[in-house]
């Protein structure tokens, strides 16, 4: 990791927990991205290195960190590394989830190529060097993501949570 001397609050790890809803067709195998807004903005793919996709009624736990961090569980870790280039946590204004699309034939007859995702709860923790507690963002549902209901979900800081 190349440390940027101007980064005063370097991000060392990001953890994302997603509780998938209990309803029929709540889960998805479509790509999902965590986005950071602000001057340090970028997106990260939430894809587990081992295991399946987001399944109905289950929790997905994604850890983004340096490739040599044993807790990192996303694939590919070197392309989804929040430590390289170094991100300044103070330059992150908010976070969001964005659902991508991998078209599959739709058997529901809605004339779309979509695999929806029902979110019961989303929690994001951004761990920062030399800070005892992570910076937290959270949102509760149920909220659906998909072509017929929108692909992006803003996740406020817990101080602003709705």
Named regions from a protein language model:
Residues 2-162:
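Regulatory, non-catalytic segments
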